[in-house]
Design a protein with these regions (language model features):
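Catalytic cores of secreted or luminal carbohydrate-active enzymes
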Residues: 142-161
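Conserved Lys-Pro-Asp/Glu-containing loop-to-beta segment of HAD-superfamily phosphomonoesterases
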Residues: 74-115
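Glycine/Thr-rich beta-alpha phosphate-binding loop at enzyme active sites
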Residues: 40-81
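Active-site glycine- and acidic-residue-rich loops that bind
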Residues: 14-24
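Short, small-residue-biased leader/transition segments that mark boundaries at the very start
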Residues: 2-5
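Structural motif
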Residues: 9-14, 38, 104-106, 150
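N-terminal accessory interaction module
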Residues: 166-225
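Acidic, Mg2+-coordinating phosphoryl-transfer loop and its flanking beta/alpha structural elements
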Residues: 105-139
Length: 225
């Protein structure tokens, strides 16, 4: 427990599912007293068998709310250090250092997994098996946009189709197409991954050109398994 007799110099808050109110209170007391505040990751939620549960970031927010102090740094995502360290650890075991252009950041969260990849200049793959959904992908700001999109990890061994923009402004991905017209993103097939890939390109292009997109201006997807 925190005590004024032994002032902590630093607080490191990480993922601990058995964290109690008293633990968070002790962290807050120490931070308020001047301890430097570090965190390991800021995932607000975490997928579990029964649904979406609070993640490390939610518990971090409780301490931030109580103290008004933001962590000075995060050891995990959305910083890219973890990806750099993974490459270096692999090389330390006697393997060649894998270049960034031969690496890919994979995850289900845009604001941690994918942002970390973008910060570190890694290609990234967003999968739909966790918290990110098609709407969030279409509305993603530039720093949260993945290089590739897949329904799950099974597509890692398959070539990704590249959406192509034609002269009319329509984005095509194999047999699916998407376009922006009258303030709306339209898609030919809202049940396929290719439709989503095309729609994402149309939405991002429109947003980058100043369009104000929202859930009401992008199509609803129901991706078929």
């Amino acid at each position: 427990p925190y005590t004024t007799l032994f002032r902590s110099q630093a607080v490191i808050q990480g993922w601990y599912p058995d964290m109690t109110w008293q633990m968070m209170a002790d962290a807050a007391f120490a931070v308020e007293a001047g301890a430097t505040y570090f965190v390991t990751n800021r995932d607000l939620t975490i997928p579990r068998e029964l649904g979406i549960a609070p993640g490390c970031g939610s518990m971090i927010r409780a301490v931030i709310t109580a103290t008004g102090v933001e962590p000075v740094a995060s050891a995990g995502k959305p910083e890219a250090y973890m990806y750099d360290e993974a490459r270096e650890l692999n090389a330390a075991e006697g393997h060649d250092l894998v270049p960034k252009e031969a690496s890919i950041a994979i995850g289900d969260r845009l604001d941690t997994d994918i942002e970390a990849g973008n910060r570190g200049d890694y290609d990234s793959l967003a999968v739909l098996t966790g918290v990110t959904n098609p709407t969030e992908l279409m509305l993603a700001p530039s720093h949260l946009r993945p290089t590739f999109i897949a329904p799950d990890l099974r597509e890692l061994g398959e070539a990704q189709p590249e959406p192509v923009r034609d002269e009319s402004g329509t984005w095509e991905c194999r047999k699916a197409s998407a376009w922006f017209e009258n303030g709306q993103v339209h898609v030919s097939d809202p049940t396929s991954m290719d439709g989503l890939r095309a729609a994402v390109c149309a939405a991002w292009e429109a947003a980058d050109q100043g369009a104000q997109l929202s859930e009401a201006t992008v199509p609803v997807f129901a991706i078929e398994a």
